[in-house]
Structure formats: structure tokens, C-alpha cells
Amino acid sequence: MSDSERTSLPLVFDEPRGRKKPPRHLADLAPDERTAYAKELGLPGFRAKQLSTHYFSRLVDDPDQMTDLPAGQRAELVAGLLPGLMTPLRTMEADRGTTRKTLWRLFDGALVESVLMRYPDRATMCVSSQAGCGMACPFCATGQGGLQRNMSTAEIVEQVVAGARSLARGEVPGGPGRVSNVVFMGMGEPLANYKAVLGAVRRLTDPAPDGLGMSARGVTVSTVGLVPRMRQLADEGIPVTLALSLHAPDDELRNELVPINTRFSVAETVEAAWNYAKVTKRRVSIEYAMMRGINDQAWRADLLGDVLRGYGDWGWVHVNLIPLNPTPGSKWTASDPADEREFVRRLEAKAIPTTVRDTRGREIDGACGQLAATEA
């Protein structure tokens, strides 16, 4: 890899100071906090439960449909607990309408994207957790855009609720349905926005009507390897799936592809992933974007297998190979299919379960690593 191909962006862990915060929303709050907040606004506490039912269970966004609320108070209640957070600017479709990428403008003008993917047996929502990203991975369009700000818990949840509405209303081919899976693999490094992401996970998994009532097993949180946060997440008691974006099994290459590796080595990062599996009893997914001539050599497959096998073969890990998706100006390309097959063969020879990701939304820049949130 030449010097011109390497990232020159710094790692950024904290959002810029002084940014105005999004409006406070029901989804930012735990159930007991909602009741207290309603009372702060001079409203009866039980109204918070009614609004939670409309938002999370009925997926209502029209105050006129909230007929159990006094007509004279609806506007006040909605403005106080369900303020508008995001405006859809554009929705693009692929895969005969079953993949939908939405560009959102947040209250302060920041742009983010989410992707809804419907399959015959499930519907997955890929959500953003930050506007931009500070992890500076050179092959990722989001990382090359830098970090604008963290998203709030409610802004994250609203992406899922909006997708759930689209499915419930039959707007996606296949008839009415529901969101079964959520992956934090959109824009941003989820564990760099830890508090808001954890709050969103709790809202997604809280039983209805306090939340969406999803199974924690249907939620995947990705990370490039913020080791202290990986350890913290393991102790939260929420058995979500952890996906580690590894992309290289050796420090020399990973330092270039995933700059956080200069802070936390491959050994430290994989050990934290193993610890997550040990504590939660949930299998960890190792994400590995296949780049032609960069990280797809057979010897690297062997090394990856050895690194993972070093922590035992008790089913703690699974490798998910991702054909590299093109991004504007990128000098990297996807691996040759023959090299990809050999990579899989070598990992499986070391008893590492391995799959190649079904790439959805590539033609609408909605696939892994392509989200850049531009209005162009």
C-alpha cells in the first residue's frame, strides 16, 4: 500500500464541543423518566405511557390518530414528548424495492443515512449512530468524511421506528411486516457514542409498549475495536451480538486499514472480543472486508485462523467476509472470487465458521462502507 493510499485523517473520539443538543424525546428516556418528564411539562404522568404505546406499539406519527388523548392537549403532548427529530430528504431503492436507503436531515442540518433490507424470512434495519465517523478507516466513505457529531438515543431509535412504519404500512414489497433485526453498521462508530447507543439498544429491547420489544439476539452492535467499551458492553447484561471489524490479522496491515489499531493491537482487540463471547455466551462476528492484493492473501487467511483458534474452538467466533464495496476515489477493489473462495477454504480448514456476506444496496451506495450522506 503506497503512502498516497493511506489515511491522513486523525482519529477523533469526541464530538465537537458546543453543538446544540437535539430536542428531548420520549425515546431518550427510560419509562420512569418519561413519567417524571411529563409531570415536569405540567402534564399527567400517565400520558407518557399513552404516548409510548402510540410511538412504539402502534407506530403512529399523526396526532389526529391518538384519539385517547384529549383533543385540546394533543399538540402540546406531542410537542413535549414526541418532537420532530429527523426529516426524510430522499429514499432510494434497489433489489426490486426490498432494499431502501433513506437520507435524513437532523434538526441541526446534519445528514445521516439508514438502510432497510427485507428478506423472505426477516427484515433488517441498518442504522447510523453518528453523523460521520472519527475512526478514519481509509477504505470507508463514512470514515473519510470525518465526525460531525454523535446522534441522540432518540435519533437512533427513530430510524428503526420509521422503518417499522414502512413495513407495517405495506410500503415495502412483500406485504405488511415488522423489523426483526437491527444492525449498528451504518454511519459512525457505535462504541464511540456509547451512552446513546446503549440507550437505543434498551429502547429496542424494552418490552412493548415501553420499547419495541425486540429480542436482544436480533440486535448487532459493530465496532472497529474500542477495547475498553467492548469490555464494558460485555458487563451490561444485554446479550446483543458483537461484530468486530477486524479486516486484517496482523498489526502492520491493520494499523493502516483500521487506525484505531495503533491504540489497541490485534491481540488486545481479539482478546476483548473473546471476553465478550465468554461473558455473554453470544458468538462474536469477525467482519473482514476483502480487498484485492491487500488483505486477501492465503497466508493471511491462515494467520487469521490461527489468531482466532488461539482462544479455543468452543464456537465463540464466526467470520463474515465482505466483498469490498466501491467508494468514490478509492484505489481498492474487491478480491478476485477465486481468492475469496480460497480464503474461505483455509479458514474452514481450521474449523472457523465462515460466510460471505450477501451485499445489498451496492448500486444505491447503501452497502457496507458506502454511506456518505450527501444530497448530491
UniProtKB/Swiss-Prot annotation:
Cofactor: binding comment: Binds 1 [4Fe-4S] cluster. The cluster is coordinated with 3 cysteines and an exchangeable S-adenosyl-L-methionine.
SUPFAM superfamilies the record matches: Radical SAM enzymes (SSF102114)
Gene Ontology BP term (one): tRNA methylation
Domain Radical SAM core: residue ranges: 119-362
Binding, [4Fe-4S] cluster: 133, 137, 140
Annotated localization: Cytoplasm
Active site location: 113, 368
Main localization (coarse): cytoplasm
Pfam families in the cross-refs: Radical_SAM
GO MF assignments: 4 iron, 4 sulfur cluster binding; metal ion binding; rRNA (adenine(2503)-C2-)-methyltransferase activity; rRNA binding; tRNA (adenine(37)-C2)-methyltransferase activity; tRNA binding
Enzyme class label: transferase
Cofactor: [4Fe-4S] cluster
Family (UniProt): Belongs to the radical SAM superfamily. RlmN family.
Note: Reaction proceeds by a ping-pong mechanism involving intermediate methylation of a conserved cysteine residue.
Name this polypeptide is given: Probable dual-specificity RNA methyltransferase RlmN
Source organism per UniProt: Nocardioides sp. (strain ATCC BAA-499 / JS614)
Gene that encodes the chain: rlmN
